[in-house]
């Protein structure tokens, strides 16, 4: 029992040590504006006043705020941020205040190539114009000379002309002698000349800054303008003597414009300069090849599909003809009805003069070969009930067909005579055991089967047509005759 108590005590002490000992009490910061809720919302943090910065993430009072160049900015998180100092090579643009940081920029003569927030990460030197741009050449820029202004800049800073920039002013042509030259200029150039003439300011003439006049040759105008430029620190003179109202640079400007105009007329213009679109022969050749390939493949597939369709149609047509016109075995009803009637008549007719019934042939006597007319012969039942003369007596089942192995039946020749009687060759029949013909004895059957073997009229010998149904005929003499010949069988 004591061991259990000790174990419970140790467990209780471990649980007490698991709780934090210096956990602050939960407070609310709604009453005091100088405090704001901390990140965990369990305590309040002191809000540093303007000009003070906190010394810890969550200051607890004024003692934790210190006075320095640190800026206390009230942002969205209500935290204080420090003021930044400008890096070497940067100058202060705007000082640090209670609600805005310090803004730094590059020194004079430099420009910011990599901007940063309220500062610049990399400054690069500015360039000035070394050679101005012409109709054939772009502006050539260079680093400023040591004699430049204090800020390291020059009025002719290197700038790339774009569609949004306004071109430099061109002096107006006030001399009547220059009307013919003005007519050669395009309308846009004359408009720019008229607009820029109002902005020109006359500068006193000086011999050192006076630019030399170009040579009369238009081809040397560009060289004169390029090589003879005033020093970088001076401004070229754009005016002449007081007696003349035309600027000194008018002639050179006009010569340049006329030269550019005439050269543009004489030289063939390219599609890129005129702005007209043109087709690349490489891409056109590719698209033409693709179109030809697509058309060829489509035509090949269509022809192949048509050939396959014709082949399938022929195959399906043959199959349809085979299924539609397939020969079928003729049934009992397909045989001529009159032949069946004649068969019934020949088997049941009685001789009125003799007064006795003719004995019918046994089933083996009418059997033929297996290959000719077996369908109709097998389906024709022998009417044995008609022998007794009772048409309403129950019909006995037909005799099973006797195979050729148990009989020696053989019809040698068939002769068709002009008389009503058909004579057939000798027929020998083996009667199955245990069965005798009804209404006759063996002697009478042998007497009836004795037939004349002498052939008659061999020229009338016929053969049964192929595909015809085998006909079994029993020819019976009419009732008025006295000669009672045996019933004969014919097979066509």
UniProtKB/Swiss-Prot annotation:
InterPro entries to which the protein is assigned, alphabetical: TNFR/NGFR_Cys_rich_reg, TNFR_8, TNFR_superfamily_member_8
Composition skew (Polar residues), residue ranges: 160-178, 339-360
Extracellular side: 19-282
Phosphoserine carried by residues: 334, 348
GO cellular component, one term: plasma membrane
Tissues where this protein is expressed: Very low level of expression. Detected in spleen, thymus and lung. Highly expressed in HTLV-1 infected T-cell lines.
Gene Ontology BP terms: cellular response to mechanical stimulus; positive regulation of apoptotic process; positive regulation of TRAIL production; positive regulation of tumor necrosis factor production; signal transduction
Compartments, record wording: Cell membrane
GO molecular function, one term: transmembrane signaling receptor activity
Transmembrane segments: 283-303
Coiled-coil residue spans: none
SS bond list: 58-80, 83-96, 86-104, 123-141
Glycosylation sites: 151, 178, 224
Keywords: Cell membrane, Disulfide bond, Glycoprotein, Membrane, Phosphoprotein, Receptor, Repeat, Signal, Transmembrane, Transmembrane helix
Known role: Receptor for TNFSF8/CD30L. May play a role in the regulation of cellular growth and transformation of activated lymphoblasts. Regulates gene expression through activation of NF-kappa-B.
Oligomer status and interactors: Interacts with TRAF1, TRAF2, TRAF3 and TRAF5.
Name under which the protein is recorded: Tumor necrosis factor receptor superfamily member 8
Organism, as annotated: Rattus norvegicus
């Amino acid at each position: 029992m004591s061991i259990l108590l000790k174990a419970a005590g140790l467990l209780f002490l471990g649980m007490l040590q698991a709780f934090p000992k210096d956990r602050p009490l939960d407070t609310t910061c709604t009453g005091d504006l100088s405090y704001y809720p901390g990140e965990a919302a369990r305590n309040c943090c002191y809000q540093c006043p303007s000009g003070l910065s906190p010394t810890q993430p969550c200051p607890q009072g004024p003692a934790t705020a210190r006075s320095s160049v640190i800026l206390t900015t009230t942002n969205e998180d209500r935290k204080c941020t420090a003021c930044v100092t400008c890096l070497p090579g940067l100058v202060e643009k705007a000082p640090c205040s209670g609600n805005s940081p310090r803004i730094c920029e590059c020194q004079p003569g430099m420009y910011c190539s990599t901007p940063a927030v309220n500062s610049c990460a990399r400054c690069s030197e500015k360039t000035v114009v070394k050679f101005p741009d012409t109709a054939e050449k772009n502006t050539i820029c260079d680093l400023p000379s040591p004699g430049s202004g204090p800020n390291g800049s020059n009025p002719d800073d290197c700038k790339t002309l774009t569609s949004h920039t306004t071109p430099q002013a061109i002096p107006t042509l006030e001399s009547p002698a220059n009307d013919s030259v003005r007519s050669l200029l395009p309308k846009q150039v004359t408009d720019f000349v008229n607009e820029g003439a109002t902005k020109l300011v006359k500068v006193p003439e000086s011999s050192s800054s006076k630019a030399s006049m170009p040579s009369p040759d238009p081809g040397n105008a560009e060289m004169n303008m390029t090589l003879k430029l005033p020093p970088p620190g001076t401004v070229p003179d754009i005016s002449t003597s007081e007696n003349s109202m035309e600027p000194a640079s008018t002639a050179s400007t006009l010569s340049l414009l006329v030269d550019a105009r005439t050269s543009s007329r004489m030289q063939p213009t390219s599609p890129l300069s005129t702005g007209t679109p043109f087709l690349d022969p490489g891409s056109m050749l590719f698209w033409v090849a693709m179109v030809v390939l697509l058309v060829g493949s489509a035509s090949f597939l269509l022809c192949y599909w048509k050939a396959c369709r014709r082949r399938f149609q022929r195959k399906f047509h043959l199959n349809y003809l085979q299924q539609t016109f397939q020969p079928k075995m003729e049934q009992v009803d397909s045989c001529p009805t009159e032949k069946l009637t004649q068969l019934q008549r020949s088997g049941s007719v009685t001789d009125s003069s003799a007064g006795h019934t003719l004995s019918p042939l046994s089933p083996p006597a009418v059997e033929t070969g297996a290959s000719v007319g077996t369908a109709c012969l097998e389906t024709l039942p022998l009417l044995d009930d008609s022998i007794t003369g009772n048409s309403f007596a129950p019909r006995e089942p037909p005799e099973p067909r006797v195979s050729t192995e148990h009989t020696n039946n053989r019809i040698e020749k068939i002769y068709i005579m002009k008389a009503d009687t058909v004579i057939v060759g000798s027929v020998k029949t083996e009667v199955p055991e245990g069965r005798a013909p009804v209404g006759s004895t063996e002697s009478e059957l042998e007497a009836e089967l004795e037939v004349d073997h002498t052939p008659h009229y061999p020229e009338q010998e016929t053969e049964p047509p192929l595909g015809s149904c085998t006909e079994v005929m029993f020819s019976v003499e009419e009732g008025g005759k006295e000669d009672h010949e045996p019933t004969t069988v014919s097979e066509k």
